[in-house]
Regions:
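Conserved FAD-binding catalytic core of PHBH/FMO-like flavoproteins
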Residues: 64, 78-181
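Conserved N-terminal helical subregion
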Residues: 1-91, 99-104
């Protein structure tokens, strides 16, 4: 079996567009903690973690929102940050256009022998991108999160592979950029 070789390598440096980093990878738990603390400290925000909206009634000057804890709140601005199947968006009558690409994501974490140097790597091929996102070391080894986009049937086949075959396929798909995954 041959190892696929990348056809073309493009290095993107954030400094090409700014002296600031292009982005940061922030763990979800840290984002949630910091956002929660900031909201709790804001006197004009009523932060109700664990409480869902159940009904939205809008008028020109304000909206009335019924909550899962049995209360109601009034607001001049309602933000629907409740996911891709947003109930707030539906109740507000905001339509959505969806494009399906026939892809599924496999997401997991791996260790590897070559340090990632805090650099994300994305490899594009048919089926979708294969992305390595730096994570802190795990048990003394460099570690990365992987988001592997594939067509639905290929993603299913990959997820059903025996571990050894999957690891070989994963390392080949990464072009062994960080060594065997």
């Amino acid at each position: 079996e041959t190892t696929p070789e990348p056809r073309e390598i493009k290095d993107f440096k954030a400094s090409d567009i700014s002296e600031q980093p292009f982005g940061w990878n922030v763990p979800n738990w840290l984002s949630r903690r910091e956002i929660s603390q900031a909201l709790e400290a804001e006197p004009r925000v009523q932060f109700l973690p664990g409480v869902a909206s159940t009904k939205l009634f809008t008028r020109d000057q304000e909206a009335k929102i019924s909550l899962s804890n049995g209360t109601q709140v009034k607001a001049r601005l309602v933000l629907g940050a409740d996911g891709r199947s947003s109930e707030i968006r539906n109740q507000a009558g905001i339509s959505v256009s969806t494009t399906r690409f026939g892809q599924k994501a496999l997401a997991f974490a791996v260790t590897h022998p070559i340090p990632h140097q805090n650099v994300s790597t994305e490899i594009h091929r048919s089926g979708g991108p294969f992305t390595l996102v730096p994570l802190p070391d795990y048990q003394g080894q460099p570690s990365s999160a992987v988001v592997w986009m594939e067509t639905g049937p290929n993603a299913l086949a990959l997820s059903n592979m025996p571990t050894e075959a999957f690891e070989a396929e994963m390392s080949a798909r990464s072009c062994n950029h960080l060594g065997p995954l």
